[in-house]
């Protein structure tokens, strides 16, 4: 829903917060709010109801409805409602989020200690320590050990002396583990952000940056089997580095270790959902890069079983559904199941786009739109492909994903070629060429392909076209046969598309012809383009 927030003098904060609540969260807040309201008629609950039922924000009308004439009074009411909603949401999560549980337990322990109820405090502290160790919440573990140590002040000297060494050794171990965790998580976040620039690094500078991260990772102290969370951060960082350095066999092995860790520590899935989802993404991206389509299908299936059983947070499960959709769509495309491609897009694309806008970063949304755009192209829905590509190009102006930039600039002329819009094609090629040249981003592959498409569109006969294509494909063999430069064909197989023209085949039929049966099975494996 598009909400009108532009009216001068309106503060949209509380409006956005209330409109962003789920139906269950709204019901819970109303239920909790009535417990503390005076005869269920407190102004903050009335304001909540008015905003919830409003399509636009108009603070003058809200003040009139509440019979409030003082702006300071209204500002205070909004601030109170804002805080009360957030406090209630946090309280609502106390039995779902381990972080929230530990926070409440920590405050309860402090309260018990202040009241000198030391036995109860110590009992609760031990329970909280066990929970923090199970979920590797090292920050809380350190704080809880400090709280536990306060009990020493109430022991006699002999008890104090007997306990001190053991307690402080335990505290030191917790601090050491926290340091290892922080270092691994820091590097993971740093490497993960590189994928926001491009999932397909090719230039020497990009590869050198990732290589440095991998060297730093290898110098870190590895976790042992008792710290699966630290191991998951460490291995996910390693897998990302291996994927972006095109070390695909090693990445496959690392991804297998990651899956085994998740499968053996399913209690961590809902507590660290983004790490879990990133594991799936990296695994499937690597499968497609290795051209192992059956493996990609198997991995999304096995991870899906874990997600359905243990990923309880609705937001993150939607995120999984987006990844699942994108993976399945690529599987159907690469195995030439075009009716399934069409059915999947017609049935789910709209919902997935809504989920993406709701939960994904702008950079991640582009990957989903790109997959659907290519699907439209393969299905020969040229107008839909062009329309969606225009959206991708516009959004990427603010995001600047390098891989999407090159993809959109090259794929647009290909669409126009299929539409036989020669004037627009000529204009698009000149515009893209000058855009990249002016920014010193014109790489040899893009330069050659754009110049070739310009010559191809001007060819006077089929014979001339075929000769141009033959000559160009011979030059492209240098890219196709190089394990790194072959990645230029990863997002879209320009080589195969041109081969289909040479063979006078629809691109769909060309892709079907490229399939070969796996020996002893009914499955199909796409022939390598290397």
Task: Identify the role of each PLM range.
Residues 100-103, 107-110, 140-143, 147, ...:
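"A position-specific structural signal for the A-helix of alpha-solenoid helical repeats
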Residues 149-164, 170-178, 188-196, 281-292, ...:
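Alpha-helical linker/edge segments of TPR/alpha-solenoid repeat scaffolds
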């Amino acid at each position: 829903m598009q909400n009108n927030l532009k009216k001068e003098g309106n503060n949209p904060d509380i409006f956005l917060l209330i409109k962003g609540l789920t139906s269950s969260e709204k019901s819970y807040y109303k239920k909790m709010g009535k417990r503390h309201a005076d005869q269920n008629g407190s102004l903050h609950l009335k304001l909540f109801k008015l905003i919830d039922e409003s399509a636009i924000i108009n603070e003058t009308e809200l003040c009139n409805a509440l019979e409030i004439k003082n702006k300071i009074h209204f500002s205070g009411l909004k601030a109170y409602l804002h805080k009360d909603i957030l406090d209630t949401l946090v309280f609502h999560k106390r039995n779902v989020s381990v972080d929230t549980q530990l926070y409440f337990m920590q405050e309860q322990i402090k309260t018990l200690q202040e009241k000198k109820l030391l036995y109860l405090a110590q009992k609760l502290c031990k329970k909280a320590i066990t929970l923090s160790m199970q979920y590797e919440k090292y920050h809380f573990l350190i704080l809880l050990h400090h709280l536990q140590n306060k009990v020493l002040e109430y022991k006699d000297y002999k008890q104090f002396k007997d306990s001190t060494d053991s307690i402080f050794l335990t505290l030191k171990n917790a601090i050491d583990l926290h340091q290892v965790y922080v270092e691994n998580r820091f590097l993971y976040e740093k490497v993960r952000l590189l994928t926001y620039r491009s999932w397909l690094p090719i230039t020497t500078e990009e590869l050198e940056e990732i290589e440095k991260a991998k060297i730093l990772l290898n110098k870190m102290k590895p976790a042992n089997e008792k710290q699966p969370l630290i191991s998951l951060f460490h291995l996910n960082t390693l897998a990302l580095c291996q994927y972006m350095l095109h070390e695909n066999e090693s990445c496959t092995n690392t991804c297998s270790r990651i899956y085994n860790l998740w499968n053996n520590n399913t209690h961590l899935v809902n507590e660290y959902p983004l790490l879990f989802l990133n594991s799936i993404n990296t695994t499937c991206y690597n499968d497609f890069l290795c051209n192992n389509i059956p493996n990609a299908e198997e991995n999304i299936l096995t991870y899906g079983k874990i997600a359905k059983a243990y990923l309880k947070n609705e937001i993150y499960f939607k995120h999984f559904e987006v990844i699942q959709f994108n993976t399945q769509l690529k599987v159907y495309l690469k195995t030439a199941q075009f009716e399934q491609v069409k059915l999947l897009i017609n049935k789910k694309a709209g919902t997935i786009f809504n989920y993406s806008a709701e939960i994904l970063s702008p950079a991640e949304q582009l990957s989903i739109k790109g997959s659907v755009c290519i699907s439209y192209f393969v299905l020969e829905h040229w107008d839909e492909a062009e329309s969606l590509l225009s959206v991708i190009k516009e959004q990427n102006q603010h995001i600047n994903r390098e891989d999407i930039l090159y993809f959109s600039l090259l794929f647009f002329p290909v669409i126009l070629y299929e539409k036989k819009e020669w004037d627009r094609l000529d204009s698009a090629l000149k515009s893209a060429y000058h855009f990249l040249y002016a920014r010193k981003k014109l790489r040899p592959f893009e330069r050659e392909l754009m110049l070739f498409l310009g010559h191809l569109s001007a060819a006077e006969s089929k014979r001339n076209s075929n000769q141009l294509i033959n000559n160009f494909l011979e030059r492209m063999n240098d890219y196709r046969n190089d394990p790194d430069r072959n990645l230029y064909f990863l997002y879209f197989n320009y080589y195969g598309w041109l081969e289909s023209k040479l063979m006078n085949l629809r691109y769909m039929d060309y892709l079907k012809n490229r399939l070969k049966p796996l020996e002893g099975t009914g499955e199909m494996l796409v022939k390598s383009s290397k």
